[in-house]
Design a protein with these regions (language model features):
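Short beta-strand segments
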Residues: 1-2, 51, 102-105, 135-139, ...
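Conserved N-terminal catalytic core of the sugar/cofactor nucleotidyltransferase
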Residues: 8-15, 26-105, 109-117, 121, ...
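Residue-level signal for inorganic ion chemistry
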Residues: 32, 88, 107, 150, ...
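Short coil/turn connectors at secondary-structure junctions
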Residues: 45-46, 68-69, 96-99, 129-133, ...
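Residues that recognize and position ribonucleotide moieties
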Residues: 102, 192, 264
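Conserved core of the sugar-phosphate nucleotidyltransferase
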Residues: 113-234, 254, 331
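Left-handed beta-helix
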Residues: 196-353
Length: 353
């Protein structure tokens, strides 16, 4: 899934170049490129599909030049994950009615790839013999209120998923701490494994407002009229996540506990943990930025330029972002930042979105 806007990472992530096409690390590969490279170790490349927006066609092609044209599915509008997954599911079913699929966001950071690959292969093997709707749940290493949590209904056993008891979307810090202490909760990774026909049946049962629009898909997908068909039905497509549309309604939701290192790089706080370099005072920095920091601590300092010095004195818990056309300086407080970024919707800032 590579169609998000990444608005919480403004001004680095913009509508015309969202975060899946950016490289926040020092590896020279975008999130999309790294996700594709990670998945092709487990999934044959001819079976990897990318769902993105029509406006990002050229960027996807630039980052993944080897991707077959038929494996690039283009939505006219972003309608969240449930419509995106429905689109991919119908396209996969047309090619292989018995397919077992993995659904993954394109903008997550994953380490310990050997553990990730083992977990994915085990989940695929289990899903192939059942109708279970499986999500990978990451064993939490800290109480983090930026992630969603999944409560297990029972004790985890090696090689088998556990029934899901509850979902909690981004609890406050105190509740997140309680969750981690109980050892009943996992981070919701947003990575899913299931048979294509199983998720189709679940979507038809719990989200008919999506699947009813897809009437006629067998005749439309894979033809010259595919894009026109998709563009037409998306004018009425609801905006809803797969968790709300299906996973929180079904009694067939399972979680596979996993211990690979994972992070949803969804906001500046998560990027603070992810950035490659932290100085002795807790400032998170990208290595290419030229900076002079004095009496400053626990800041996020990021620059897209290497020809400009960032001189900072006396700042604590701030975000300082410097790009070609925008300089942003604001406290790290997430709620204040959210309110601040919401003002970008005003017409006078349109050229900077």
């Amino acid at each position: 899934m590579a169609g998000g806007i990444g608005s919480r990472f403004w001004p680095i992530s913009r509508a015309d170049q969202p975060k899946q096409f950016l490289d926040f690390s020092i590896q020279g590969r975008s999130f999309l490129r790294r996700t594709y490279d990670r998945m092709k170790v487990v999934i044959p490349e001819e079976n990897i599909l990318v769902v993105s927006l029509e406006r990002y066609r050229d960027q996807v092609r630039a980052h993944l030049p080897e991707l077959p044209e038929k494996n690039l599915l283009l939505e006219p509008y972003n309608r969240n994950t449930a419509p995106c997954i429905a689109f991919a599911t119908y396209a996969i079913l047309q090619r292989d009615p018995e397919a077992v699929t993995v659904v993954t966001p394109s903008d997550h950071a994953i380490a310990r790839h050997d553990v990730f690959n083992k977990t994915l292969l085990e989940a695929l093997a289990y899903a192939s013999g059942s109708n279970a709707l499986i999500t990978l749940g990451v064993v939490p290493t800290r109480a983090d209120s930026n992630f969603g949590y999944i409560q297990m209904a029972g004790k985890a056993e090696d090689g088998r998923p556990v029934k899901i008891k509850t979902f909690t979307e981004k609890p406050d810090a105190d509740l997140a701490h309680v969750f981690v202490e109980t050892k009943e909760f996992l981070w919701n990774s947003g990575i899913f494994v299931w048979r294509a026909d199983a998720i189709r049946q679940a979507l038809e049962k719990y989200a008919p407002e999506i699947t009813n629009l897809w009437a006629g898909w067998p005749e439309a997908l894979g033809t010259d009229g595919q894009q026109a068909f998709v563009d037409r039905i998306y004018t009425d497509m609801p905006r809803i996540s797969i968790d709300y549309a299906v996973m929180e309604k079904t009694d067939n939701a399972w979680v596979y506990p996993a211990e690979f290192r994972w992070a949803d790089i969804g906001n500046w706080e998560s990027l603070y943990e992810y950035l490659a370099y932290h100085d002795e005072r807790g400032n998170a920095l990208n290595r290419t930025a030229r900076r002079l920091l004095v009496d400053s601590s626990d800041n996020i300092v990021y620059s897209t330029r290497d020809d400009k010095l960032m001189a900072i004195r006396g700042l604590e818990d701030f975000i300082v972002i410097d790009t070609e056309d925008v300089l942003m300086i604001c406290p790290r407080d997430e709620q204040k930042l959210k309110d601040f970024l919401s003002r970008l919707a005003m017409p006078e800032y349109e050229e900077y979105r």
